[in-house]
């Protein structure tokens, strides 16, 4: 089954598939400078919390690899600036900060072990590759846990794009769907278009179609109608940040889907890696919500579709934990009360990762 490759580390640099051009064009760019990677994250060449984390790790490694520093101390100072630049790109996706913190820890370990810049550079590149490899294993585990909750047959709704394009593996929400479909479950996916950036229409529909999984594309204002038919058996989405109490930030429009699911007795699930947990914040009120350009609302692929008026564009909303039936992770399934179940999973052992490519 086809699996998209949004990002790869190569000898020539970090290669990213430009997701802004999908589905009409499949164009990739090769980046050799961490500033270019930061710009690619900010401008959504790559998007999706786990994939942003992979990109940040690779950006940090690129910065170290191509640093002109002549000493470890000079490299330390430069690495601080590298992480600062990458950290300013997307404020809501906690995987970004998780990845940078991990790369910082590895950098400190390498500097403590060796004064050879070549050793440090090599170690950072290997760590970035390992982050990507772990994301692939994580997606598979999430998919296997979550698939058990999918119906034997019927409609499953998702939101935005939480597939391979968003993670670098098989996807979180779409990973659950993919594994369930491969198990022989006769599911049909309802894909809201996800205005204003159309990640559902452009990316999720593209991934599912390429993978041979049956789907129907719907507009965002059709969600309630389809819920009310009684044919939707489950909803599964990804997440960009999960607070300690289970409140979850995901792409704008997710909250209203969760409310409609509750009203229509449809279980609403979240599929996300442990790295998306932010147990340092008590609830969703503390999750920063990224405000993107109003032009992404008033224009569609460069064409103005609205008059020259004020437009709001919060990129995410927060779904309260009370609407979430379960959260699928690579270490198992969390259920309410999330304040205890999330911490238990976060403290658990990480599944083993194969070193095979």
Model-found features: residue ranges?
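Short beta-strand segments
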Residues: 17, 55, 59, 97-99, ...
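Ligand-binding beta-strand-loop-alpha-helix segment within the catalytic cores
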Residues: 95-156, 187, 191-235
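Histidine-anchored nucleotide/phosphate-binding helix
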Residues: 171-182, 258
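Structural signal for hydrophobic packing residues in well-ordered secondary-structure cores
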Residues: 45, 64, 68, 83-90, ...
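Conserved phosphate/anionic-ligand binding catalytic regions in large, soluble enzymes, centered on
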Residues: 43-56, 90, 96, 158-169, ...
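Generic structural signal for well-ordered, non-membrane alpha-helical segments
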Residues: 30, 34-37, 49, 53, ...
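Conserved phosphate- and dinucleotide-binding cores of soluble alpha/beta proteins
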Residues: 186-187, 192-357
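Long amphipathic alpha-helical segments
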Residues: 5-111
